[in-house]
Amino acid sequence: MFDPETLRTFIAVAETGSFSKAAERLCKTTATISYRIKLLEENTGVALFFRTTRSVTLTAAGEHLLCQARDWLGWLESMPSELQQVNDGVERQVNIVINNLLYNPQAVARLLAWLNERYPFTQFHISRQIYMGVWDSLLYEGFSLAIGVTGTEALANTFSLDPLGSVQWRFVMAADHPLANVEEPLTEAQLRRFPAVNIEDSARTLTKRVAWRLPGQKEIIVPDMETKIAAHLAGVGIGFLPKSLCQSMLDNQQLVSRVIPTMRPPSPLSLAWRKFGSGKAVEDIVTLFTQRRPEISGFLEIFGNPRS
């Protein structure tokens, strides 16, 4: 009933409002077009067009069918290529989770453009997670690959890792903050008087990592790095920021960096993917990162001088 030729004929008549114009578009005779529409209406048992001497217009049923017919025809026409892609070992869907520290909208768009050109029938799902939330997505939510898991050792032996680099940290506050000119190192008693601004770990199953905060100190939780930086600039609170993200603000004296009793060590981050069952799209992403290709350079900017 809904073979490709019938769908093309129905769509052409609906879009042109004329059997003769549809015939011209499809290089068929008007009689052929009219017969196919008549047969379609007989098979469905409903009138799809109102006919006049000058034009044909869709009935309510015809309007509904038109909405569906375009999708069906597109699906039928793409199916041979989709089947070939599956046969070649290409995934139907790839879920990618990205660490909040490495998340860069332009870098994500560039990677997706590269992938979509090569794998037009693969569905790509991008998620942004924080700290152990990245591992959580890999271990418990079926994600295929992670850009920026914490550490350089896998939490399960079913994953492979490639170290990407280490994030260097600076303890910062606004230039006009009351602690900005106090003698270093700042004491815990001095620090405890002011709120710590943090981004909460997004892990749902794994134990959340606790960001920097002293016992008894007020904590302000914000949703992302952009808000955390803005909060520090506004003098809302104190805390650690990646050096590469705050260096320009330190240079122009919007922020100041101070020494505290326990400085945050560098945070190593890695690419992680499943050892078994990965398809060609994931393999290509891994190659982009292991070869440090330009297509993924935006994800590595936070490291300053990423491994070459």
Curated annotation (Swiss-Prot):
Domain of life the protein comes from: Bacteria
Keyword entries, A-Z: Activator, DNA-binding, Transcription, Transcription regulation
Disulfide cross-links: none
Annotated region of DNA binding: 19-38
Keyword set includes Lipoprotein: no
Keyword check for Metal-binding: no
Family the entry assigns: Belongs to the LysR transcriptional regulatory family.
PANTHER family for the chain: HTH-TYPE TRANSCRIPTIONAL ACTIVATOR ALLS, TRANSCRIPTIONAL REGULATOR
Job description of the protein: Positive regulator essential for the expression of allD operon. Binds to the allD promoter.
UniProt-recorded name of the protein: HTH-type transcriptional activator AllS
